[in-house]
Swiss-Prot record:
Superkingdom of origin: Eukaryota
Modified residues (Phosphoserine): S930, S1077
Pfam families in the record: Hydant_A_C, Hydant_A_N, Hydantoinase_A, Hydantoinase_B
Family statement drawn from the similarity comment of this UniProt entry: Belongs to the oxoprolinase family.
GO molecular function, one term: 5-oxoprolinase (ATP-hydrolyzing) activity
Name of the protein this chain belongs to: 5-oxoprolinase
Record's GO cellular component terms: cytoplasm; cytosol
Enzyme Commission numbers on file: 3.5.2.9
Organism: Saccharomyces cerevisiae (strain ATCC 204508 / S288c) (Baker's yeast)
Name of the coding gene: OXP1
Top class in the EC scheme: hydrolase
Effect of substituting D11A: Impairs ATPase and 5-oxoprolinase activity
Amino acid sequence: MQKGNIRIAIDKGGTFTDCVGNIGTGKQEHDTVIKLLSVDPKNYPDAPLEGIRRLLEVLEHKTIPRGIPLDISNVRSLRMGTTLATNCALERNGERCAFITTKGFKDSLLIGDQTRPDIFNLNIKKVVPLYDTVVEIDERVTLEDFSEDPYFTKSSPNEQEGILEGNSGEMVRVIKKPDESSVRSILKVLYASGIKSIAIAFLHSYTFPDHERIVGNIAREIGFSHVSLSSEVSPMIKFLPRAHSSVADAYLTPVIKKYLNSISAGLSHAEDTHIQFMQSDGGLVDGGKFSGLKSILSGPAGGVIGYSSTCYDKNNNIPLIGFDMGGTSTDVSRYGDGRLEHVFETVTAGIIIQSPQLDIHTVAAGGSSILSWKNGLFRVGPDSAAADPGPAAYRKGGPLTITDANLFLGRLVPEFFPKIFGPNEDESLDLETTTLKFRELTDVINKDLNSNLTMEEVAYGFIKVANECMARPVRAITEAKGHVVSQHRLVSFGGAGGQHAIAVADSLGIDTVLIHRYSSILSAYGIFLADVIEENQEPCSFILGEPETILKVKKRFLELSKNSIKNLLSQSFSREDIVLERYLNLRYEGTETSLMILQKYDDQWNFREWFSEAHKKEFGFSFDDKRIIIDDIRIRAIGKSGVRKEKTVDEQLIEISHFKKADVSKDASFTQKAYFDNKWVDTAVFKIDDLPAGTIIEGPAILADGTQTNIILPNSQATILNSHIFIKINQKAAKTLSKSGYELDIDPILLSIFSHRFMDIALQMGTQLRKTSVSTNVKERLDFSCALFDSKGNLVANAPHVPVHLGSMSTCISAQAKLWEGKLKPGDVLITNHPDIGGTHLPDITVITPSFSSTGELIFYVASRAHHADIGGILPGSVPPNSKELYEEGTAIYSELVVKEGIFQEELIYKLFVEDPGKYPGCSGSRRFSDNISDLKAQVAANTKGIQLIGSLTKEYDLATILKYMAAIQTNASESIKKMLAKMVEHFGTTKFSGEDRLDDGSLIKLQVIIRPEKEEYIFNFDGTSPQVYGNLNAPEAITNSAILYCLRCLVGEDIPLNQGCLKPLTIKIPAGSLLSPRSGAAVVGGNVLTSQRVTDVILKTFNVMADSQGDCNNFTFGTGGNSGNKTDKQIKGFGYYETICGGSGAGADSWRGSGWNGSDAVHTNMTNTRMTDTEVFERRYPVLLKEFSIRRGSGGKGKYTGGNGVVRDVQFRKAVTASILSERRVIGPHGIKGGQDGSRGENLWVRHSTGALINVGGKNTIYAQPGDRFIIKTPGGGGFGQYKD
């Protein structure tokens, strides 16, 4: 041992703590590895300290008693990673803290982005913020200019008027400074209440932090132990994620500091030891700078560093996929081009985190994921048995899990597992109980299917479905970002990774799997190898390409670099060991999606070229005519640790002089029966440490040791190297139906797999659409849907985007399929939005792409529907509140080819969007035609993505199989709906149900449902519904179809495929010419966003499920400009904005579904789930000041269960605009049921700045607002359920 040179790295996970130590030689053969339980209070109080003690005993060759401070004078480096912050966030046991924010915004984190996390869960469960209490400070700043200004007006600093230049270069208007005396009084009261940690987040503090600093300094003077300023924690635009991040820091960092102090107390003579911690960005930092916010992904980040450092070869530059499978989840990541991939906004434990983190995707499928059979499908997760009780085999009464399936199929080696199971933790794995539970589950499945599946086939089916679940996030980080997944190598690590890695790789088309010798402790090993990182970032708002920009940016780079280098030099790094990475966070003007672009070469300034390349790769396009904005300047200084450099896999392969196939009789420890490809096979079990480098093992085989089990499939070959296992997969030809030894027309395993794959296609289409669009509606508010259809237009899979699109898209596609039957050619793409042919309201533009087989047969369709912010009509935003005729709402497209044989028809689109709607009296063409074009191209790109993914599927399965399961998945959904409706009849003892409600204008929606399961009759009859109105509340039939589909999916209460099968058993009767089936030419814009909500309320009330929700979308639009559509007429430049506003959800009823529930506050319900634009983005883009966005307390109807509260949204205009509101429930409040009180009605108020007049504008109106005018929208609360008792 070299005195004073010991290196130690530790990763404390939820179950195990992994430790690596080296005596100082840096050679791998001198490493010592220890794995111990993270929680074992009978033997030690703290796992990392115990790990250090055990390592020192080995490395220093002496006995060290427990319970005394550990002398680490011989330890040069002590590095740690921990899941402490993540666990605190998940378990909600962090430090009590307060949230200090701008007046009017105390409820910001409660409202969030106004969406609900699960659109099909009627009992909405929003994430509860981490703070204990919230305090508002009367302060305010805003941005003086707005980016949507068609005349690009730029202000200059003017201190007298309170206009100052912010850190970003943007002009900031200081409206109200905080009163320090008042602040001091407020904080003293807060301090006296016992709160000692606070988070401060004020609007626009990313560029103007002065007010936060004033309040922060006062807080420190008073004695608060931790003060988190959002402007320091995350100086980036977007108030919501920045505020969440500051609160997370205040909640987690004190816990981290206490833990670090406890570690320090357990150590002695640490003066010369570098004690560092792994951050979420993959870099190490001194303990004094380690924060809760930056430790969220501490452990997983170590794994990324581990595999990237040991498995990437810069000579061949083959990118890697990290596959880290643990007990409760699987983490996947990507490493390519020798660089870590970072993201700057993620969600952990439901909390938005805005901080540099490695791009790691997690799926709820791990060794302890629970296996279940529901609605004819094999389910894996998301529920987990966790460590306690754990899998059934752990002898603690746990359920069947993936681990049990592997054990039952002979894919685990019980002899290699320690005897730590059972109540006394002294028994081996329990195969007997696992077998019994699989027998019971197999009997249930066979009864449901009238089949003869074996237990092995069932267990193997669950393994296949689990593998598909884990393949999905891999596609998300590769295909969804423009990478070809099959061109990667997959690196397996984690406790369960080796059991599934080859199968997952095979399903993805990857032919190489790498497993490092330290795969079971790779996170700890990555921490051992990691570099030290110093990050510095500042906001800015410069225009790339302007002459002064380069000088300004280089100056800032220099200032940030000096600080970072200084900090690393103080940690004993030489200047030669420090590498600087310079980044600019860039976006196109008018968009909000930015990319962090690295300066590739120190002597080059080609950021425009680098950004365009990155944008084209990520999103599929770039702009030549848009200016590029610099949002942030970032420096990442890397202190190279130089701990060790491992030889690459390819170098190791070259060095081996002799390869030898393993002799099972001599080299294997023993053989055991294992189940592969539907049969039991004698499978050799090898101890990894017994195999010399150069040994080749043909699958099937099991390579294992005390910490890992690696399954080598029959189509694979493993080569043992000095530090890796190198596995090649013989890629199979296209798969056909599984020959499983039983005769079933539909294989339930394949049905489960195709359910995942079809949904994955729709989800990836949505990802592509969001990435490639430019409008706020699509990119920020997520007002779009994507889906896959069969050749008749029947819905096969619809991603859970916007509920009102769900059933209506199928009506649209099937109508187009009939209209164009036999006429479409490859390269054709359709466009439509007309309510007569399956459209909903005109702004929802549907783009449809047919797909053809190699023989020219049309085999399916993909489609995307997106809300366009302006398509012409009488008002900006194309959502006029008082439209009477369809033409007033904008362009109405019955059916056209937007792409004809591969050629985008831009002239036709101009005619449709600008010329045609502008011909009508009082109407304009589209006011944002460039956005229309961009979003249409994005929709075409999303459809193209869907067709490409189906093409990939045809390489795995033959076309006949795919088409067969497209039909089967619809049948499965149909059967699930029929079972649910039959249960309802059985519970209520009746076959007839009825409900009704009236709109604010008195129009009646009436429903009678007749369910006779024995006759297969399921009738939804809307006879008695009022006639269509001379207004825009008319709802095309497709909308009612959507409402029924949505409600039925919610009532099932379980995860079933969402497709046309849900509606196939039903007979839907809607009287022609009624409100729900208007004649051609009727105005419909309100039908989609208002009547749809009320139809949903009626259906849910009919089945006694819940009281009315707000029954409204609160559609708010404003803007300026327009044109007649005539190219020779002068166009008035302008802009348009559209948003929908949340309200209260109805209380749940005590019913056949179980006990009721309280409604949720401030959330979108029923047929919409679009996001609210972030306040800072809202004020940056438009000439507005948001005065208040808060919960409207007391607006929910009281009852046994209380309805959720609505919100108050107070918008002040800073320029003259036309503003409109289209809303309901302003006359008749949301109804309570069974004695529950009604929710409060909504209210829309106009405050005129010139006179101070307060005017109620009613539910549907347009105003012509002047600067200083305010529009206050108070949204309805939800109805209550049951009698209220004080």
